[in-house]
Amino acid sequence: MATETTKGTKKQLSFWQIWNMSFGFLGIQMGFALQNGNASRILTDLGANVESLSWFWLVAPLTGLIVQPIIGYWSDRTWSKRFGRRKPFFFVGALFACLALILLPNADNFTAYFPALLIGAGFLMLMDASFNVSMEPFRALVADNLPDNQNTKGFSIQTALIGIGAVVGSFMPWILNNVFNVPNNISGVKVQPNVIYSFYIGAAIFMGAILWTIFKTKEYSPEERIEMGIVSKEKTKEKFKIPATMWKLGLVQFFSWFGLFCMWVYTTTALREHTYLLPTMETIKAGLALNPSDITLKSQLKLSEDLGDWVGILFGIYNGVSAIFAFFIPMIARKFGRSKTHALALLMGGFGLVLMFFMPNKTAMIFPMLFIGIAWASILAMPYAMLAGVIPSERMGVFMGIFNFFITLPQIFSALFSGPIVKHLFGGNAAYALVMGGIFMLFACIFTLRIKIK
């Protein structure tokens, strides 16, 4: 029977060793940022309405629910002297992710075979599956290579790199339009050129970042793991059991990610139709199809596309805040404990989401992003730091994959029910979905205080 021995036998790693180990996450998160900031926009450009948007976003959590535990299970059992344990999954996932990043903004080019929306949903599924193949082993890699006293630092550095990648990805469409004059308001096209080229650049950076981690990171061999006492030589026959702490963290994750999902799906629509009182994109484009020279409709189209770019800026800002705040998390956690640190961050995130409803213009929307960025930094680091200390090393990958259930299930729940709620309870006003998300995150704050981990 296997017994987990002291994790302090793992070598202490330097800042730059941890940085290199997590650098691939910069590319992964740039891909996620492009998806989060532009998928709703692309889908509405292809003809989706606000009530059906959340249904398309079901693709992401469903693929994560299926893919991550499988990848975690097999990466725990994979070893190649040449390629390692987790790194083969990084590379294969990156290949398919880059393909999906190139294909999604070009979904309209395949309409001779299938409807554009169906093609877009298919490419979105490929993208999410590939992201998950690359992403899941990264969480396990940090826990594999770091002793327990460096877990918070490791996941915080990972969060900082996630933030940097997300800032670049979120800002990219705006930068291409405003700095390099790549157009964003061409009539008659489904997806604007600045968005398309942003996805191409994202694909290149994604692959480059993954390759950096592959070539710069060493993994412990099975023999080294036994020699250092990380795992026992004997095969485990213990009954598979999820620790109580993992269930408690799962409840926190449920309410946290429900709130985040509401923000990702509905911010663009809320900014356009609640803050600026614009007609739907479907209405604007239908009007231009009948009267292409209508000046009012043209100006509304331009403003709508500019606001779509601005959502990328807003998402980039909260990710930038998270990248900065991540460096302070280990210090704060040492002083107040991991649970209280995470609870405070979630409190700020819930406040920020509710605050978005009351902002009078796009510039004012920056203020709530500061609070959301603090919550995002903690969400990406603290649950994993708390979890890593209570699960066996030899099952790190599969447990991290199972823990992903508590991220994907709330997104599935939100995708199934938030659309009808917005339509029937909120009268089609997507801004109320942001308030609902904020309330859920406040519940996450309360449940975090029940977890007793220093």
Q: Predicted segment positions?
A:
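Intracellular loop-helix junctions on the cytosolic face of multi-pass helical membrane proteins
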Residues: 1-15, 108-122, 131-134, 138-141, ...
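Helix-loop boundary and gating motifs at the non-cytosolic
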Residues: 6-63, 248, 252, 256-281
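Loop-to-transmembrane helix entry/capping segments in MFS-fold secondary transporters
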Residues: 50-51, 148-158, 308, 391-403
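Helix-to-loop junctions at the C-terminal end of transmembrane segments
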Residues: 66-83, 324-337, 422
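C-terminal ends and interior cores of transmembrane alpha-helices
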Residues: 90-114, 347-360
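Hydrophobic core of transmembrane alpha-helices in multi-pass small-molecule transporters
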Residues: 100-134, 364-378
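Intracellular juxtamembrane helix-capping segments at the cytosolic ends
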Residues: 133-146, 378-392
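C-terminal transmembrane helical hairpin of 12-TM major facilitator-type secondary transporters
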Residues: 321, 333, 339-383
